[in-house]
A protein has these predicted regions:
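Hydrophobic alpha-helical transmembrane segments of multi-pass integral membrane proteins
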Residues: 8-11, 39-55, 131-134, 154-161, ...
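Juxtamembrane C-cap of transmembrane helices in multi-pass membrane transport proteins
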Residues: 19-34, 47, 87-96, 104, ...
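Membrane-interface helix termini and inter-helical loops of multi-pass transporters
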Residues: 25-37, 94, 142-153, 203-223, ...
Length: 331
């Protein structure tokens, strides 16, 4: 899928956010059944990558040199955009609340704005600053005001590292494809990232545990593999392809702000499938996030991530059983 229109890129970005946002509602039953967060995310990443593999092989026919040229980009996505982000998030939620860790990680768009500010020594466009304030306020309301509290400094440091990994994901995804199809890039990054996470689990760095009985979902008992397959296909395979495709068109800054809609979609799916309450504050938060995205888009491409940053090649968090930060599973 190759697009060039900014409007089409925005639509694809929203589809990606919606896809990422489904993960919490479908993974939560597995977590409640005894799956560890690291086992759930390792399975979704590996299965999602394997689902994309046949499509990637077809899309890469005649384009294998493009994959070789992008080898460092693929490696960076697998190690930083997938594995490191997940690893640091899991480390963070061992000592700080899940909502707090999710809120910190989702501040990645502001990190990108700050990096550009420092590197260009130019104050960002006023609309970008306004959009950033709206987005932060919306995140706090959707994730939950209780996410802001005094917590363990080490946990905060790990969450900050996860935020950096999330920002890196957007910078990598927004780089020119140089002939590499998004589906091929996503498949390679997910398979390699899943193998890294699996290796960390096998060596005991990440705890891996799973159960294989029926799980309740939407008022009925389903085999354990049903929600896992949905998450792997929709929340991982489709979501990563859509995210990478849209980031190439929109750029890292706007794509990262649009991704904040994940928390809104996560709350909506939790309400529809799990019966979780959708509060007026969450609806207001969603409106603020939309306002922030609109402001950033209105600012245009000014102050986008500079080319000097992109060669550094800097998703998407893991839901550990609460709905508000369900997008923690996403990157």
């Amino acid at each position: 899928m190759k697009i060039s229109s900014p409007s089409a890129g925005l639509v694809v970005a929203v589809i990606g956010s919606l896809s990422f946002g489904t993960s919490g509602a479908f993974i939560k039953p597995l977590l409640e059944a005894g799956w560890s967060p690291s086992a759930a995310v390792t399975a979704r990443v590996l299965v999602g990558g394997l689902v994309l593999l046949p499509l990637a092989l077809v899309s890469l026919r005649g384009s294998w040199p493009a994959l070789w040229r992008a080898r460092w980009r693929v490696l960076a996505m697998a190690l930083a955009g997938v594995s490191a982000t997940q690893f640091f998030y899991f480390a963070a939620i061992q000592t700080i609340p899940v909502a707090t860790a999710a809120l910190i990680e989702l501040l990645a768009p502001l990190l990108l704005v700050g990096v550009v500010w420092v590197m260009t020594r130019r104050i960002p466009h006023a609309l970008v600053l306004v959009g950033s304030l709206f987005a932060v306020g919306g995140l706090v309301l959707v994730v939950g005001p209780g996410a802001i509290r005094a917590v363990d400094p080490l946990g905060l440091a790990f969450a900050a590292c996860a935020m950096v990994g999330c920002a890196i994901y957007f910078v990598i995804a927004a780089r020119p494809s140089d002939g590499l199809p998004p589906v091929g890039f996503a498949a390679a990054g997910l398979v390699l990232g899943g193998l890294v996470l699996g290796g960390l689990g096998v060596t005991g760095v990440l705890p891996l545990s799973a159960t294989f009985g029926p799980v309740p979902l939407a008022g009925t008992a389903l085999p354990w593999w049903v929600p896992l397959v949905i998450v792997a296909v929709v929340s991982t395979a489709l979501a990563y392809v859509a995210g990478i495709t849209s980031a190439e068109v929109l750029g890292s800054r706007l794509a990262s702000f649009v991704s904040l809609l994940e928390v809104v979609f996560a709350a909506l799916f939790a309400w529809l499938l799990l019966g979780e309450q959708l509060t007026p504050l969450q609806l207001l938060g969603g409106a603020l996030i939309l306002g922030g995205i609109a402001a950033v888009r209105a600012a245009g491409s000014e102050n986008a991530v500079p080319a000097t940053l992109e060669p550094l090649i800097p998703v998407p968090l893991m839901d550990a059983g609460v709905v508000e930060p369900a997008t923690a599973l996403d990157r």
